[in-house]
Amino acid sequence: MITLSIRYRIDHNKLRDFEAYARSLTEPIRRCGGDLIGYFLPTRYAGPTNEALALINFPNLAAYEHYREALAKDPEGTASVAQVESSGCIVCEDRGFLQKIS
C-alpha cells in the first residue's frame, strides 16, 4: 500500500473554491481506483492558513498510474480540474508518496 500525498499552497481568500474542488473529486477519485483518505484544509487555530493536503491510498504504483490515466478521461474529474484552474485558488502543488509503517 502506498499513499499519495498532495500538498497544496492555496490562496487563503479562496478557501471555498478549494473546498468545492475537493468535494467534487470524491466520486471521480473512487471511480478511478483511488481510496480517498481525505482532503484537509487549514484551521484558524495554528499554523499556516494557505496550506491544504490530500491523501489517497493505492495498492501499488501500477494502480496509481492506472488511476491517473482514468482520472484524465473522467468527465467529472476533468470538469473539476478546469473549474479549480479557472478559480486560481491553487497556487502550487507538490506530490509525493508515503508508506505506512504502523
Locate predicted features.
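Absolute protein N-terminus
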Residues: 1-2, 102
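Active-site-flanking beta-strand signature of metal-NTP-handling nucleotidyl enzymes
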Residues: 2-8, 53
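Short beta-strand-to-loop capping motifs
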Residues: 8-12, 56-60
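Short, surface-exposed ligand-recognition loops at beta-strand->loop->(often short) alpha-helix junctions
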Residues: 10-20
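An amphipathic, aromatic/His-enriched active-site/gating alpha helix that lines ligand/cofactor pockets
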Residues: 20-37, 57-95
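A short beta-turn/loop motif at secondary-structure boundaries
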Residues: 42-48, 85-88
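A structure-centric signal for secondary-structure junctions around beta-strands
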Residues: 49-51, 92
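Edge beta-strand at a domain terminus
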Residues: 97-100
